């Protein structure tokens, strides 16, 4: 469970860096207008929503561990590239980041529920609460770093957060308990 919590930390700190400061990064780096930056933020957040939606069927098809591993580690090349791209590349890259990194949330919840059968509600509450809490702490911390350095520096250091996804290799292969299996099994038609 501790490994999953580290993965949640890396994922939500990175997501909050984009959702909270992406517009400032675009304005500062590319000198776009506030309105243009907000449209680009909308495009990123739409990709996050789509990735979250797609994560469920991917988890059903390939398994939670594979989706967690693929999502958090798979986003690393995109996050490492982001601070070094031009405007068009940044927009395209942010769409890829949103789609890939957000696809793991449902997989993480399902995986944690498989690790702790009988605590399905507690696990879901822990993960939702923790993700929002870490996001709030991340926004404040990254804002303080940006104030002391620059918004570009924040994106350079945040680019490495998904590397924490290497811990995914240490995730055990859980056996679904009857509670999780009953939830995960589609109803007969």
Report the location of each language-model feature:
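Paired small-residue
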Residues: 88-97
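Intrinsic disorder in cytosolic terminal tails and internal cytosolic loops
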Residues: 171-189
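Helix-to-loop junctions at the C-terminal end of transmembrane segments
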Residues: 51-63, 146-147
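A late C-terminal transmembrane helix in Major Facilitator Superfamily
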Residues: 113-151
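Extracytoplasmic gate region of multi-pass secondary transporters
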Residues: 1-52
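Structural signature of the two symmetry-related core transmembrane helices
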Residues: 66-81, 156-159
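Intracellular juxtamembrane helix-capping segments at the cytosolic ends
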Residues: 103-116
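Symmetry-related core transmembrane helices of the 12-TM Major Facilitator Superfamily/SLC fold
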Residues: 155-171
